[in-house]
Amino acid sequence: MRLITDMVLVFTAVVRLRLGLLFLISGGSKFLRARSVERMVANYRLVPRSLLPIVKLMLAPAEVAAGVLLLLSLWLPVYAIAWVLAFGLILVFTAGVASALVRGLEIPCGCGLLLNGHVITHATLVRNLALLSLLALDLLVQRTLLP
């Protein structure tokens, strides 16, 4: 039983490591492409124009913070805030993707350097739902297997 528990804990640590790196890359790319971030958010047609500059200023730092906190949560007691921030961001991104798909928008996902220019599809939605599921699994493991 201990071997299975250890394997699950290693798996969830890898999930946090990979998601942390994903957020760092995505947020970092938004810092590098700051001019296009506002347009990318505007493409989703969900945020009032008056709020676009605020969202633009907050998005990259929020993603980088989520990435840093997820990585630090492997060693420091910052898991709760890391989880809430990461889950919240992915949830908002997933809602945006779902809304765009329902409305038939063919727009770039704005996912960062790795998927720059990638047009959202149902696969984008499934990917985001998988990320949410992995975070939910990680939370379950943290609440049940660790003291």
Tell me what each language-model feature is.
Residues 1-147:
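Membrane-interfacial helix-loop segments of redox and metal-homeostasis proteins
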